[in-house]
Each structure stands twice: as structure tokens, then as C-alpha cells.
Amino acid sequence: KAYPQLELRFDVEDRLVDLVNEGVDLDIRIGDDIAPNLIARKLATNYRILCASPEFIAQHGAPKHLTDLSALPCLVIKERDHPFGVWQLRNKEGPHAIKVTGPLSSNHGEIVHQWCLDGQGIALR
């Protein structure tokens, strides 16, 4: 409202955008893959948690240890710059790379979120 002449177009992409050639003035990225020729500022820290529906927990039980995740159906989000199905987790012993699998995966977080709510598996959100 303070700038009524300003026009805004909000595009969501799962790819690296060529800011100059595509005429982009502002780019918000998730991750650490910032090209050295860009001026960047950290906006927030993205904390993640493991999620499952009450129905899923009732059927499969809750994992007691991070390694239990490998034997449970997990919902994998395909992220641009991360190995598929490898969750980087941390507990009191430190960081762990846990390989997970499951019947459903997507590159769209909201779809995985809905699957999780529907009791289809454990999600990292």
C-alpha cells in the first residue's frame, strides 16, 4: 500500500534461476548454494522436525532411535541440492545421515505434508 505503483510477480521454482538473463530483481532461496557473484543475506534458519500422524504411529509405532527410520515408510521430498532419501538429522550424539525409503515421494512439500496427515508415512518438515 505504501508503493501503489510497485508490481509484484511471485514465481515458485525448483531450479536455479538465472537472475540476470531472466530479469529477476529479488530471489529467495532455501539452502547454502549461493553463487559467489551474488549479494546474499540470511533471512532465517530453517529448522526441520520429523512428523507422523497419530494413525501412522498407532499402526507402525514411533521410532525410538534415528536408525529406526530406515525400517519405516518415509515420505521423501526431492530437493534440488540434496541426495534423494538421505535425511540429515541431529540428536544428542551429533549429526547423522539416515537413508530412508518409502512408497511415496514428491518434489512438492505440500503434497508430502498431506500424505503425512493422511497417515502414509513419516515426513521431515
Question: Can you say where each PLM-predicted feature lies in the sequence?
Answer:
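Central regulatory/effector-binding core of bacterial HTH transcription factors
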Residues: 1-36
